[in-house]
Amino acid sequence: MPSTIEAIYIILIAGELTIGIWGNGFIVLVNCIDWLKRRDVSLIDIILISLAISRICLLCVISLDGFFILLFPGTYDINVLESIMDAVWTFANNSSLWFTSCLSIFYLLKIANISHPFFFWLKLKINKVILAILLGSFLISLIISFPINGXWYHLFKVSHEENITWAFKVSTIPGAFKQLTLNLGAMVPFMLCLISFFLLLFSLVRHTKQIQLHATGLRDPSTEAHMRAIKAVIIFLLLLIVYYPVFLVMTSSTLIPQGKLVLMIGDIVTVIFPSSHSFILIMGNSKLREAFLKMLRFVKGFLRRRKPFGP
């Protein structure tokens, strides 16, 4: 019988999982249906589909990890299973962060106007550049995830065959290396989003000064596009600022022993990021927003028709 804290944890994690998978699944479904209808897919749709799929995987892994910790705490005594879970979790987490940074770079190249030859070349080659970044993000996530976790497990296994002193040294070094690699892997996408934000802000300030000189008004389409992109990147950065410290605590478990309560709180907080950001993406995309509002109207009408008549 779970305790009160464990029951609250189960309710929260199940609710977050349902909301997150539904939101990200909605993004995948709408874009795939549109893809089949038009027989074509846009670059932004590819980014959103990739991001949503990676987050669905991340949500499932985090939730599965939480239920193992809570209901089957002895599961991770099987080192192979722990290594597999670590690898899948690391891959889903890193791919989610990298795909989000790819979305920020897309906003930057699509909207910003910066008078530099290299930036101008990137804008001309935006499709190839973004697709290359997407593929690179996928490969980087694979490199960071599976080989590192596999090597760590191998060294951890070797450490148990020696004396206690040697075991501590061997198991701690790969654990520290793993933690450092995970942290750097999450930090690079954050820095790319931060750079995109400042370049978008610089482009907006410059554009605002230009339209003030020509007295054309401040709410032109380019300004609106700048503002929407900046808001999207700011929201992501704020969510990541909340997510990243918890991520550091969760990845330090190989060096610092953690209690069940800390791990449960960590799971709850880390699930908030991929769950909530999906709805921000839906409301920030005209096609997704229209489909979402249409679905809400359908559900509202269905519930109204199903409402029983009073006496």
UniProtKB/Swiss-Prot annotation:
Its main location: membrane. Residues 1-9, 73-86, 147-179, 257-260 are extracellular. It is a multi-pass membrane protein. InterPro entries: GPCR_Rhodpsn_7TM, TAS2R. It comes from the Eukaryota. It is found in: Membrane. Residues 33-52, 110-128, 203-233, 284-311 are cytoplasmic. One of its GO terms (cellular component) is plasma membrane. Disulfide bonds: none annotated. The keyword RNA-binding does not apply. Belongs to the G-protein coupled receptor T2R family. Gustducin-coupled receptor implicated in the perception of bitter compounds in the oral cavity and the gastrointestinal tract. Signals through PLCB2 and the calcium-regulated cation channel TRPM5. PANTHER family: TASTE RECEPTOR TYPE 2, TASTE RECEPTOR TYPE 2 MEMBER 9. This is Taste receptor type 2 member 9. It comes from Papio hamadryas. The gene is TAS2R9.
